[in-house]
Swiss-Prot record:
This is Na(+)-translocating NADH-quinone reductase subunit B. The keyword Cell division does not apply. It comes from Chlamydia trachomatis serovar L2 (strain ATCC VR-902B / DSM 19102 / 434/Bu). It is found in: Cell inner membrane. NQR complex catalyzes the reduction of ubiquinone-1 to ubiquinol by two successive reactions, coupled with the transport of Na(+) ions from the cytoplasm to the periplasm. NqrA to NqrE are probably involved in the second step, the conversion of ubisemiquinone to ubiquinol. Belongs to the NqrB/RnfD family.
Amino acid sequence: MLEKLVDSLWKICRKSKFQHMTPIADAVDTFCFEPLHTPSSPPFVRDAVDVKRWMMLVVIALMPTIFAAVWNSGLQALVYQSSNPRIMEAFLHISGFKSYFSFVSQEIGIGSVLFAGCKIFLPLLFISYAVGGTCEVLFAIIRKHKIAEGLLVTGMLYPLILPPTIPYWMAALGIAFGVVMGKELFGGTGMNILNPALTGRAFLFFTFPAKMSGDVWVGSNPSRIKESLATMSSLAEKSHFDGFSQSTCLQILNSTPPSVKRVHIDAIASNILNLEHVPTQDVLQTQFATWAESYPGLTVDQLSLEQLQNFVTTPITEGGLGLLPAHFDSACSLTEAVYGIGKFSTGNLFFGNILGSLGETSTVACLLGAGLLLLTGIASWRTMLSFGLSAFFFAWFFKIMSILTTGNAGAWAPAKFFIPAYRHLCIGGLAFGLVFMATDPVSSPAMKLAKWLYGAFIGFLTILIRLINPAYPEGVMLAILLGNVFAPLFDNIALKQYRQRRI
């Protein structure tokens, strides 16, 4: 039946009036059946696995991240727009799989979560394929060549790196820009020097920054989410410092001013977690001894919120820690991110119970996809490993240098440098970029040594942008695009090194 339909399509396209539509018939035929094209030059290998089937393996590898995108976006949307502080409190204090699924089944409903997630993700996926596919077909007809299969993966990657609240027309504009300017302008699939999906996202990021960062990570209606959060904070009688918000870990990291030091978040953490010892304990005890002369009987790890704020914001000369009062709420938020408190726990970051772009939240889903890509040899393990190790090393390097340059266990160094290195691998789009974006075989280097250099370069830039650059909260997108630009240089260096060894 399917073969007859394809044959009918070929008969229509072979007519002189419709010959320009031949690329469409060829695309449908090769998608459904084994290609019948005979190569014009050796090697002559008979194999049913053509590029389209190769691309399908990448699509299969993306399935865990797609499911995670649907599930997490649906759950977060229903919780954050509920206007019910009890549900929000229960959600934020989930610990373990049993309590997580118990909460979902009792408070939300599995069907409701999946339905809400599909309403968010599927329209973006449809727009990506419809608009991107139209661009591909138009260029194939104009150039009179076959429709390339690159969009099969690009069309799926693109919606996974978008925030759930992105307007549909912006999503369409972004994929059109990515396909046309990022790929077709260079000659089409296999000729592009930049990753098309990331090119489209970068275009949206710099053209419509307010829609690509900030409070854009929950549901499909940002205004409704803001009203719901305000209502829940009011009903729960939350203060300005502990009110409900939709800030991501990277937003907090980026927005925290340099005046927030390690000693400030250690003081806050010692009270929130009741820690008897923190890395800057000696500095805390020295300052607290002077400050507590007016408050006999108090201990540094047993302060009320008002007392803690007073201690942290009192001038250093008077025994306090010298933080500006306006920055106390930033210090509280960063403490949660650095110490993994509440919604920023390591489990939430790893399994994806956090806010972010649709497909970038779940590290474990990305790792499942990585397993298939590595098993089939589609992705380079050298690129993945060097990217991950480089990011980990430089996150640790900034922390160590902060300690060495300031002394006192880094007490007076900016607190953002002390987020654990392993947590950098689980926040933002690092895991997704490492597995699916940096390993793009077209825009990444071909030589083995070049892959090591390429991955290390991207990892370094990612951490540098996250910790040093105040303008952009996330560095993965820009780092990979810059890595794409320098990929030929890395190949050239590797080739020269190879020739020298041969000589």
